[in-house]
């Protein structure tokens, strides 16, 4: 802290020895050491405070720069948001609104329900349309069609090909085949029951064997009598 050399320190010590004397010199040296220690601690605390203030100032500058950058980014995002909203408004204004919504088709329009099954009304209408035709009309129409077919066949009979001939032979052979009557087969067991000879069961045989192995004469235990 103080730029003192060795010669200067020796000179100061000699002057203090002459002025204070050998009795008070040790106490004065201790007091001077305490003062110098306090002064050094004070200087160290001042340096630490200065360093802290410098660091805080640097941090404050960094914080301000960061806040400025964040504000710029926020402003740019706001500008882009406004631009996008303006462009969307322009696009929506340019579109023509629908005068009316298009007609929505339902499954009932196609004759089925939500699960894809045909509706009962449509099935009934189809069956009614088929049943409306009278049997006499059916027979008349069938007769007319047969008559037309015969007339057309009599007027123009095409030449029979090999394929048609093979089909005709196959059909006539299948029609002329004899009908085989089905033979009924009963699955009821008709075997004659034969009488089974009477035999003892295995359990009874085992019981009889155990009885045979038992000793016939059991030894009686002998009782001891204490002699008094």
Curated annotation (Swiss-Prot):
Keyword Membrane among UniProt keywords: yes
Keywords, alphabetical: Cell inner membrane, Cell membrane, Membrane, Protein transport, Translocation, Transmembrane, Transmembrane helix, Transport
GO terms, molecular function: protein transmembrane transporter activity
Positions of the UniProt region annotated as Disordered: 106-164, 196-228
A Pfam family that the UniProt record links to this protein: TatA_B_E
Subunit and interaction comment: The Tat system comprises two distinct complexes: a TatABC complex, containing multiple copies of TatA, TatB and TatC subunits, and a separate TatA complex, containing only TatA subunits. Substrates initially bind to the TatABC complex, which probably triggers association of the separate TatA complex to form the active translocon.
Family indicated by similarity: Belongs to the TatB family.
Protein's UniProt name: Sec-independent protein translocase protein TatB
